[in-house]
Amino acid sequence: GNISTTALGLSEGIMWDFNKRAVSMDILDFYQIEKDKVPDIVPSIGVQGKISKENCLNFGLVDNVTISYRAGDQPNNAFSLNVLNDGEIAATAGTSAVIYCVTKKDISDPQNRVNTFLHCNDDINNKRNGVLLCINGSGIAYSWLKKTLKINSYFEMDNLSEEVNSSEGLSFFPFGNGSERLFNHNKNLNAMINGLDFNIHNNSHIIRSVLEGIAFSLCYGIEYLRNMGLNIDSVKVGDSNLFKSKIFKEVFVNVSKTKLYVYNTDGSLGAARGAALGSGDYNNEEEALSSLKLIEKLNPQESKSMDASYKNWKKLLNKLI
């Protein structure tokens, strides 16, 4: 078969020169990679090739299946949410949590706390970069808690979290899934819970504190992105993972001071629509995403108690880092 790659893929592999809009010869030279080893570059959204007849037969596919879309998980999540233009922002909170900002700016961080690469619909006439901020400890913390407390479902956990009005002074830090690039020197803080009182706290408080701690981590990351010059006043998410939790959504919105738009989509639907667009079944991006439905919108509400909890959380975090 024929080997090919995309500019997006090269940028994710730090082999793209954003200024020259070409393969980075500096990187190739440094690692002594010959230029002819770089495959042909094809568009992320568009016909890239076809699956061989033999492989179609092996996988039970019809003949001549076209490969017409490829993107990393976060550019694809953004595409699924119609986050395609400068200033638009997508998020997810699965095993890890991500804020993904589309911008026409060439933004970079010397300390690598965020990653910048081309967005899936970048082209020479309309620059679109994706700036990615990741929190490794997110849904994995909620999953760990579910197993540890032996609770049957996330739905039950969400209900328990709503039985209390606050976490009563508990502060949770979800950094137990390896090093966090958001902190200087890619620091591994480990997860921890602070302020536990055996006479006050029960499962509901602990569950709520975990949801708050994960949301606070994203809000902390948003502060950093804003300091980089990115305007973040609204975020789009799919109706999945931690964004199914009422408490998580409310804490995220009220502390970050951003509007939240929840849509009936996920990454698999986005990939299917991207492939259909790339193969010509849709005429443009707008048509491909026309069936996207907004199912919930949340506006930030003033919450002095939650702001105080976040302030205390950051104070404790600063001691850890």
Residue map of PLM features:
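Active-site core segments that coordinate phosphate-bearing ligands/cofactors
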Residues: 1-4, 9-32, 53-236, 241-321
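Short beta-strand to alpha-helix junction loop
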Residues: 17-20, 44-48
